A protein has these predicted regions:
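Core catalytic machinery and nucleic-acid-binding channels of phosphodiester-processing enzymes
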Residues: 1-339
């Protein structure tokens, strides 16, 4: 999949054990900003809040509820706005009712008509006892799907641990996939080979020399469900692109089996990937950048106004950048690699 649900357990565990009292700037975001644990926590927590708010506002706009609220506030165009809202609500409920194969009388109950005061309404109130539970279930399901469950760029892939006995060649760039390690004074990401359809999002194809492509475009955050702690998460960098016949697969270094407690059935690795855009001058994809220099004031406090100005793709990339910063921080290295 090219998108997937942001795991609830992952969201909780990724910011666990941050020393919020420490003044040390242990977290480097996208090579732009060095943050303290408190700043990192605030940015991550509020970014998820902004993401949820944007999803909620989008749904309310699609339903016409935001327009109805505005009409009531201005005391103008209320009748038209109410009709639009009921039509949109009926449409979205109808779609869910069809998928659930509900009887036709549920749709008949949503016939829109005027009451004795001339106001638009459903033929039967949504709270009518015979229909209440089904309609409540549908509406809550819509909110859960569109607002509570947050989607991110990435998706999932079936992990295959790399086995020994294959050909390696330093000259050709063919080497074994390396696990997370401390090297040259910093934490290096684990190397993976990904399937062609995911690679295509970034303009990669089988056989490409990825060593010439910026690491920020090849960075992925992987995590498993159930997610018990940071040893269920791993920072990854794409080293190879698999042939087209590797459907839904990601090849990982053997060390991940011990780290995450994967067993020998088919385990799924869930992926967080940065959003990209096409550079019109070069014709190549590049990472959507977050203006971190604008997100904190001179006192180091998060500026919520600036955070709310960001696009959904920029907010998503904050989640990727924060996750990468935490998982590659020496402070959490032991948590990541210890089974």
């Amino acid at each position: 999949k090219k998108s997937g649900v942001l795991g609830r357990q992952f969201m909780i565990n990724i910011i666990a054990n941050l020393n919020l009292a420490s003044p040390d700037t242990n977290y480097n975001l996208d090579g732009q900003a060095n943050l303290t644990a408190q700043q990192t926590f605030d940015l991550y927590h509020n970014s998820i809040g902004v993401k949820i708010d944007k999803a909620y506002n989008q749904l309310m706009n699609e339903l016409g509820y935001a327009g109805l609220e505005k009409a009531i506030k201005e005391n103008k165009g209320i009748d038209k706005a109410r009709l639009t809202f009921l039509q949109n609500l009926r449409g979205i409920i109808s779609q869910e009712a069809t998928e659930r194969e509900l009887p036709e009388n549920y749709m008949q109950a949503l016939t829109i008509e005027k009451d004795n005061q001339g106001n638009w309404q459903f033929m039967m109130p949504l709270s009518f006892p015979n229909y209440k539970r089904k309609f409540e279930s549908i509406i809550m399901g819509i909110l859960k799907k569109r607002v509570i469950r947050q989607n991110v760029n990435g998706g999932s892939a079936k992990q295959i641990a790399e086995l020994g006995g294959h050909i390696t060649s330093q000259d050709a760039g063919l080497t074994e996939l390396k696990f997370v390690r401390y090297e040259d004074g910093r934490i290096k990401k684990a190397e993976v080979a990904i399937r062609a359809d995911i690679a295509a999002q970034y303009g990669f194809k089988p056989g490409d020399d990825l060593s010439q492509i910026p690491e920020e475009l090849r960075t992925i955050i992987g995590y498993r469900i159930p997610n018990q702690s940071k040893n269920s998460d791993i920072p990854l960098v794409i080293k190879y692109v698999l042939p087209d016949n590797y459907d839904q697969a990601i090849v990982v270094p053997g060390g991940i089996t011990t780290q995450q407690g994967s067993d020998f059935d088919i385990d799924t690795l869930y992926l967080l990937m940065p959003h990209t855009k096409l550079n019109e001058e070069t014709g190549r994809p590049e990472k959507v950048k977050v203006p971190y220099d604008k997100l904190f004031d001179e006192n180091g406090k998060l500026d919520m106004q600036e955070l709310n100005k960001l696009t959904p793709k920029e907010v998503d990339n904050i989640l990727v950048d924060v996750s990468e910063a935490i998982l590659t921080s020496p402070v959490h290295f032991k948590e990541v690699v210890t089974p």
